[in-house]
């Protein structure tokens, strides 16, 4: 059978006829390919089969069976962040993706509670006093009178002072119409914010008080806007805090600011004078007054 086929299985020696027949067959098939492949191996300097084996073994060694570490889910990562980290992450996220700013603001409430604003503003004011350069100045009460602080002190606290003033204006603008329709809420925050503004330290150089004076001008304009809105709201007239009460509060703020709130004070005085003819006598309590008559007089 082997003679009819023309070759022998394996590498056993064969007859001359079979050998010549096998050689003639290999000339047109495998041997030419093998010789070319051998030439390529000689040019590369080695067998590619042996070069690939270490790589295959290395890949198998890197495969590790068992539990592997993984990052926290988003909800857990947020739980582990403190307030400062969360704020910085949100701000950085909005900077990288400005298109989400409108969505983020749409999810915010239209206004916050009075305590939230006051807590934030008090913290900003405390930062101003905490960064005064001398301990005797840090222990000084805001209402203490005396000569103003020097230029060096202003440089040290300027950034904290501006942060407080900007925060104060931002909080007030969010708490006035049309953002908030409750005039009493706006007036209460104005009362507290104006009191905190008066507690800022005074500087001996007039130019160093520029930012504080500009903020007083803005606060005065906000007072005037809220007073106009309140005098058109009947709920303001029927509230426990009367016009006379707010007039006294605004007079105290105007005295502390050295007349910087004279414009809203005059506006409220004018409105109060228009109510004098319908004010109840001294023996009659305010609860016995008729709100309808008072409202008709305003209209």
UniProtKB/Swiss-Prot annotation:
It is found in: Cytoplasm; Nucleus. GO terms for molecular function: proteasome binding. The keyword Protein transport applies. Its main location: cytoplasm. Gene3D superfamilies: Tethering factor for nuclear proteasome Cut8/Sts1. Keywords: Cytoplasm, Nucleus, Protein transport, Transport. One of its GO terms (biological process) is nuclear protein quality control by the ubiquitin-proteasome system. Binds the proteasome. This is Tethering factor for nuclear proteasome STS1. The lineage of its organism: Eukaryota, Fungi, Dikarya, Ascomycota, Saccharomycotina.
